[in-house]
UniProtKB/Swiss-Prot annotation:
The gene is tolB. InterPro entries: 6-blade_b-propeller_TolB-like (IPR011042), PD40 (IPR011659). Belongs to the TolB family. This is Protein TolB homolog. Pfam families: PD40 (PF07676). Its main location: periplasm. It is found in: Periplasm. Coiled coil: none annotated. Keywords: Periplasm, Signal. Residues 1-20 form the signal peptide. GO terms for cellular component: periplasmic space.
């Protein structure tokens, strides 16, 4: 809806779209940012409202800048002269966003109503920024997603004894618990389907690890499989309605597939698609169309990445990376063009990316701290991962565009297994 409104507005300026074609960004490329001037117009004399609106405007500007394609800056009213100018106009509690090209007249493009819920207001600002980002660049904004992760505050003997799942915004805001199970909950994975933003995770609350279904609206997860043994590392394909996971139901940690839907749950019996002849398997991740899986196997002695075609017919797995011999945690990008993963390089686990088009891989991080669990934002150009040594771990954002990292400041405790998702479907 917003994009149609913007196109109509641009037609008045004699411009169809400044960035109609998606910006193709390679792993090590730089792009010039589009300057954006932002004006804040407050129609209230209430000091507390003015302060609050200024904080929301700061959030909005940071949101626009997050994707590394726009260069927004706050300017005084009437001094805008950038290629595009945005006004954030407040008649409390309503906020209207208007857009103008150069010195042309502003056109309204989005509006929202503030509530008494500060977290909800922040989310509304995130969503407004992402919609405007998409309209200007044809690339999804990434500020409105949620990062879910496992937070432990009682690490002992170099092992996580207990950890609950939490969610947080990219900037550390809106931090809140998702589970209250007094157990160890790990490896959350967004399902990217449904309005309730469901996710899968593994919990030890029954003593051994089992796969559960959770959502942002419910703090109690539901066990989804009735299979003996341990189950780990769930991944879901919304296109194929398939759940991939690892289980030792037959003795060896093997890769399984299970038909699954939110309405019907598990459908039929799970299929073991690889057995012990392919070593110990782990970390499955679907391609966006659900036709392939990337996973880890140690069949050659060390953990390495393999790709398995599962549709239209099952083929034998093929080795993905030959450069690195100790790899784990693969994550397929939403655009289907890249796979992020971890590899031990000079004794340290680093974040790398494999380009499926060129067959080349790149090392993205170099600091002497172990990293794990890369997870993509919806734009396929930004990652979240955890990094730390024994007894400590923090979350970091990584831009493939700028090659820069940024720590998400949350507080005490070990933060592991991040998953970035929950993005609105209407960008």
């Amino acid at each position: 809806m917003l994009r149609r409104m913007l196109v109509s507005a641009f037609l008045m300026f004699g411009i169809i779209s400044l960035y109609a074609k998606e910006l193709e960004v390679s792993v090590r490329s730089e792009i010039s940012r589009l300057p954006i001037h932002v004006e804040l117009k407050i129609g209230s004399n209430d000091a507390s409202q003015q302060k609050y609106l200024r904080s929301l405007c700061t959030t909005f500007i940071n949101d626009l800048a997050l994707g590394d394609r726009l260069q927004p800056s706050l300017v005084q009213t009437g001094s805008s002269s950038a290629p595009f100018n945005i006004a954030m106009v407040s008649h409390y509690p309503e906020i209207t966003f208007t857009l103008a090209r150069g010195t042309q007249n502003h056109q309204p493009v989005h509006s929202l109503m503030l509530t008494e819920d500060n977290a909800l207001n922040r989310q509304k600002i995130h969503e407004a920024a992402d919609k405007i980002h998409y309209a200007l660049t044809s690339v999804p904004g990434i500020s409105s997603g949620k990062i879910i992760f496992s937070l432990s505050k009682n690490s002992q003997d170099c092992e996580l004894k207990q950890g609950e799942l939490w969610s947080v915004d990219y900037d550390g805001g809106n931090l809140r618990p998702l589970t209250q199970e007094n157990s160890l909950s790990i490896t959350p994975s967004w399902m990217h389907i449904g309005s309730k933003k469901p996710y899968l995770y593994v919990s030890y609350k029954f003593g051994i690890p089992k796969i559960f279904l959770g959502s942002l609206e419910n703090t109690t997860g539901k066990k989804i499989l009735h299979l003996q043994g341990n189950q780990f590392m769930p991944a879901f394909s919304p296109r194929k309605k398939l759940l991939a996971f690892i289980s030792d139901a037959y003795g060896n940690p093997d890769l399984f597939l299970q038909s699954f839907s939110l309405s019907q749950g598990a459908m039929g019996k799970p299929r073991r698609i690889l057995n012990e002849t392919f070593g110990t398997q782990g970390n499955p991740s679907f391609s966006p169309d659900g036709s392939k899986l990337v996973f880890v196997s140690n069949k050659d002695g060390r953990p390495r990445l393999y790709i398995l075609q599962i549709d239209p017919e099952m083929l034998s797995p093929r080795l993905l990376t030959k450069k690195y011999r100790n790899s784990s945690c693969p994550s397929w990008s939403p655009d289907g063009k890249k796979i992020a993963f971890c590899s031990v390089i000079k004794g340290v686990r680093q974040i790398c990316v494999y380009d499926l088009a060129t067959g080349k891989d790149y090392q993205l991080t170099t600091t002497p701290v172990d990293k794990e669990g890369p997870s993509w934002a919806v734009d396929s150009q930004h990652l979240v991962y955890s990094a730390g040594n024994t007894g400590e771990s923090e979350l970091y954002l990584l831009s493939l565009i700028t090659q820069k990292t940024k720590k998400i400041v949350i507080g005490l405790g070990e933060k592991r297994f991040p998953s970035w998702g929950g993005f609105p479907d209407n960008q």
